[in-house]
């Protein structure tokens, strides 16, 4: 991916492209002159700070989805808990869904505050080996809308990356907003500048309306050189809690995520069932693995965690 400066216009072709400083989208950009002469913008002074923070994080995983409402944040929170079931591993969640942060509610820490010190922001502790950072902790009222343009969102994401004092972390899961917007471009750019990115998990539901956007997300990863660890199909079926009968909830007119993965040469890591008890646990900020340890879904999350760990060895 050609580099796109943080302060570039929306139509920036990238500093490494043939049209740098000359394309119509470059008009009025503060970097236009330097790009046109081949000099490019000055080095980003924050990159070394991000590199320093992330040098203590072993594995960094993006959680992506093309469409909202497919369960991306649900997957993030429960995969984090599954990974943290090993007390020897330190796990963290970074919630960069700036306009729709839901992790604090799901993790039962909605009323907590972030403390700032000379070492930076201290993420909120969920359990001894699991922490969380979200813009929701910085809002005066949890019902306040975040009405920001792209540049301000990107600035917030950069601040998360350079100012949060994570400490030593084995797995950092990054919960992103749906789509392939400014936030995704800036986030990937910053992360790749900071060092290797392990890859992305892409979340979908079985119906073609969801898969249409998943294919765009796959294209985004290819173009930005983000490795794809695999695809997770959420709400693949409903398992009756009384008789264990399985019912397909959504039509799979094109074969669902399984066929899409075959067509795209991707691995389908899990097909997670829909379980009402999970929605209740998330609304109440409870640990689903404690409230429903024997459920099919809890076991599916634990199996997924093992597959993810195997890919990161």
UniProtKB/Swiss-Prot annotation:
Matching PROSITE patterns: MRP (PS01215)
Keyword Metal-binding: yes
Residue span of region Disordered: 1-25
Annotated binding of [4Fe-4S] cluster 2, by residue: 240, 243
Subcellular localization(s) per the UniProt record: Cytoplasm; Cell projection
HAMAP family: Mrp_NBP35, NUBP1
Stated name of the protein: Cytosolic Fe-S cluster assembly factor NUBP1 homolog
Organism listed in the record: Caenorhabditis elegans
């Amino acid at each position: 991916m050609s580099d796109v400066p943080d302060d570039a216009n929306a139509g920036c072709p990238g500093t490494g492209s043939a049209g740098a400083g000359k394309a119509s989208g470059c008009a009025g950009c503060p970097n236009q002159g330097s790009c046109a002469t081949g000099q490019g913008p000055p080095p980003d002074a924050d990159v070394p700070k991000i590199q320093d923070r992330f040098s203590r994080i072993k594995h960094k995983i993006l959680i992506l989805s093309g469409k909202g409402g497919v369960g991306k944040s649900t997957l993030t929170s429960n995969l984090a808990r599954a990974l943290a079931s090993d007390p020897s591993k330190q796990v963290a969640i970074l919630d960069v869904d700036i306009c729709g942060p839901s992790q604090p509610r799901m993790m039962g820490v909605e009323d907590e505050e972030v403390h700032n010190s000379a070492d930076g922001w201290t993420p909120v502790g969920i359990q001894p080996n699991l922490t969380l950072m979200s813009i929701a902790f910085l809002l005066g009222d949890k019902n306040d809308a975040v009405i920001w343009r792209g540049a301000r969102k990107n600035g917030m994401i950069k601040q998360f990356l350079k100012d949060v004092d994570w400490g030593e972390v084995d797995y950092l899961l990054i919960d992103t907003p749906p789509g392939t917007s400014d936030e995704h471009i800036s986030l990937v750019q910053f992360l790749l500048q900071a060092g290797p990115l392990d890859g992305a998990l892409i979340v979908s539901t079985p119906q073609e309306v969801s898969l249409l956007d998943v294919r765009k997300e796959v294209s985004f990863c290819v173009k930005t050189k983000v490795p794809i660890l695999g695809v997770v199909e959420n709400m693949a079926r409903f398992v009756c809690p009384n008789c264990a009968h399985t019912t397909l909830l959504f039509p799979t007119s094109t074969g669902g995520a399984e066929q899409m993965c075959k067509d795209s040469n991707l691995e389908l890591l899990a097909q997670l069932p829909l379980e009402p008890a999970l929605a209740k646990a998330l609304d109440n900020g409870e640990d689903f693995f404690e409230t429903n340890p024997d459920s099919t879904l809890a076991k599916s999350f634990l199996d997924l965690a093992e597959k993810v760990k195997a890919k990161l060895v």
